[in-house]
Design a protein with these regions (language model features):
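Basic, glycine/proline-rich low-complexity segments that contact nucleic acids
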Residues: 1-42, 63-188
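S1/OB-fold single-stranded RNA-binding interface
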Residues: 42-46, 54-56, 105
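Conserved strand-loop elements at the edges of beta-sheets that form or border functional pockets
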Residues: 49, 59, 119
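Short acidic-glycine loop/turn motifs at beta-strand connectors
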Residues: 49-52, 131
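Beta-strand/loop nucleic-acid-binding surfaces
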Residues: 52-64
Length: 188
């Protein structure tokens, strides 16, 4: 495709912000609001620290406004609390798991998903991802305890092409996508 403007426009003014695990330790934060984000499949929770700083995290199932979220070591094993993988017992569902310590969370972030802590091996922890794949991570990587909210979003089928069009439009995606073999070579 040649010339002109982009085929799609991303409505980024509607996106509330990035959802990452904050780089704080030993803090207790309060959920001030639950926010719908068109670009995320799970709801976001606006969380406020005692010093007034605010950030977004992906909301776990059962999270509500006014709930306390503990961040750091030796926290209670309640859904929504954030701690290191080495502190979480085996068999516990976790979400928003960091790939490297301090990166903010990379795994098990879509609505209704969770990873499971399989085994703790000293300086590394093995988790089972939602795909079923086993992954070894550093024991200092942090994760949120519990299952993510927003499950059941795929239960309602897309009955019309228009529904798929508006879903893609909200996320800034192009719909429908034409396969390359159906185009002229010059139009790729």
């Amino acid at each position: 495709r040649r010339g002109s403007s982009p085929k799609n426009r991303v409505r980024s003014h509607r996106f509330p912000g990035k959802s990452k695990v904050p780089r704080v330790e030993g803090e207790v934060a309060t959920v001030s609001d639950l926010v719908h984000s068109p670009v995320h499949t799970a709801p976001l929770a606006r969380v406020r620290l005692d010093n007034g700083d605010e950030f977004f995290i992906v909301a776990t199932e059962g999270m509500g406004v006014g709930q306390k979220v503990a961040i750091g070591d030796n926290v209670a094993l309640r859904p929504g609390n954030i701690t290191k993988l080495s502190q979480i017992p085996e068999g516990t569902p976790v979400n928003n798991v960091e790939s490297r310590p301090g990166d903010g969370g990379k795994f098990a972030r879509s609505g209704g998903n969770s990873a499971v802590v399989e085994s703790n091996m000293g300086d590394s922890v093995r988790i089972r991802l939602p795909s079923g794949r086993l992954k070894e991570l550093h024991s200092d990587c942090r994760a949120t305890i519990g299952v993510l909210g927003g499950h059941g979003r795929t239960d309602k089928p897309m009955m019309k092409a228009g529904s798929a069009h508006y879903r893609a439009k909200a996320r800034g995606k192009l719909y429908p996508t034409v396969s390359g073999v159906a185009m002229n070579p010059v139009d790729h």
